[in-house]
Amino acid sequence: MKNTIILIAICLSAVITTKAETEVEKEVKQLILDNNAYTLKNLEFKGKTISKKGSLEFWSSGGLLQSMQQNTKREFDDYNLHSKHIKVIEINATTAVALYYVEGNVQHKGSENNANYLTRVMQVYVKEEGGWKIRAAHWSPLTGGKGTTETAVQ
């Protein structure tokens, strides 16, 4: 009986341990929320969120593969997007994958307004110089929603 109780306790602690977010998962999730809050306030993406090696990305517009550089500037005439249901998978101490949804309305500077922006996001993050940076991304419209109209960075 004593062994059975010990075995149950070990199994329960294993389940509880696997459900808790790791520090990496917490950091990446908070970074996504903080970067979005910055963009809501400043109508531009925060600088240096992309890896120094750049980021390969498929955008929600359905265009071709894009190569983004760390110094690429993205500005908006209107930005009211919100990240939801963020899940982060820790690959190792310096790599993580984030999956989440983004919804709201957005208008890139010089582009048309999208009042029904609704996409799925998958981003690969790497730890560089003490911070998490985007190394790859795939944005795709969710059924009933619309992606961006942009197909290239100017």
Model-based region annotation:
Residues 55, 63-64, 103-106, 140-143:
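Solvent-exposed loop/turn segments at secondary-structure junctions
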